[in-house]
A protein has these predicted regions:
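Short Pro/Gly-enriched beta-strand edge/turn motifs at strand-loop
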Residues: 1-6, 98-102, 124
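Conserved beta-strand hairpin/beta-sheet module of binuclear metal-dependent hydrolase folds
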Residues: 2-49, 141-153
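A structural micro-motif
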Residues: 4-5, 51, 78, 189
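Conserved S/T- and glycine-rich ATP-binding loop of Class I adenylate-forming
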Residues: 22, 59, 132
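Short, glycine/acidic-enriched loop or turn micro-motifs at the edges of active sites
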Residues: 26-27, 37, 63, 138, ...
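Active-site HxH/HxHxD metal-binding segment of metal-dependent hydrolases
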Residues: 37-121, 206-210
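Metallo-beta-lactamase
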Residues: 51, 95-96, 126-214
Length: 214
């Protein structure tokens, strides 16, 4: 079993976002989830021998989660992974990814378009892609079964859920995504959300006021 660890790096752009780094300590190779800001700081981290960046993963395409993507991709020459739906509907349109709202239009594309249920072999482990529409049309969570860990983006928070009043959002789809897909994971699954603190699936099933288990 690989020696894996998840680090949280909160980045400060237009709002605070939890950027996560999954590293294999046996090889020092890593991937980053949702590098939303602080491209210079992240570049410094990934220029060290203990964090060799291999890929960028996006849970969704909102501006606060993608702000450093283009700079990191250009500097390190690594691919960007996102759901096919998100790549087609959100990433390339500044009005939909909300970057134009904040006066800094961003457009980008995904090099690898992911499908629901797809499993990726990377860093000596498997990452399962779980499509969770609701916050955006192509929101995607990433489940690392070996670590009993879920990178949840803005789908599921500690005792809350993501907003659905932005373009392509849907409250009914979000609740369905959480109940049918995320709450089906083991209760001790650790949840690493895009904002706020970590939690577990079991805790959310009992205490999430916005999406009780049902």
């Amino acid at each position: 079993m690989a020696d894996l660890e998840i680090f949280r790096k909160t980045v400060y752009g237009y709002m605070d976002v939890n950027c996560y780094i999954l590293v294999n300590h046996d090889t020092n190779e890593c991937v980053v989830f949702d590098p939303g800001a602080e491209a210079e700081t992240l570049t410094e981290i990934f220029s060290t021998p203990t964090f060799v960046l291999k890929a960028i993963f996006l849970t969704h395409g909102h501006h606060d989660h993608i702000g450093a993507v283009n700079e990191l991709k250009e500097h390190f020459g690594v691919p960007v992974y996102a759901s096919k739906m998100e790549a087609e509907k959100v990433l390339g349109d500044p009005s939909v990814n909300l970057s134009s709202m904040f006066g800094n239009p961003i457009s980008m594309h995904a090099d690898e378009m992911l499908e629901d249920g797809q499993e990726l072999d990377i860093l000596g482990t498997k990452i399962k892609c779980i499509l969770t529409p609701g916050h955006t049309a192509g929101g995607m969570c990433y489940y690392i079964e070996e670590m009993q860990s879920l990178i949840a983006g803005d789908t599921l928070f500690c005792e809350s859920v993501g907003r659905t009043d932005f373009p392509t959002g849907s409250s009914s789809e979000l609740i369905r995504s959480i109940r049918d897909k995320l709450y089906a994971l083991p209760d001790d699954t650790k949840v690493f959300p895009g904002h706020m603190d970590t939690t577990t699936i079991g805790w959310e099933k009992k205490h999430n006021f916005a999406c009780p288990e049902g």
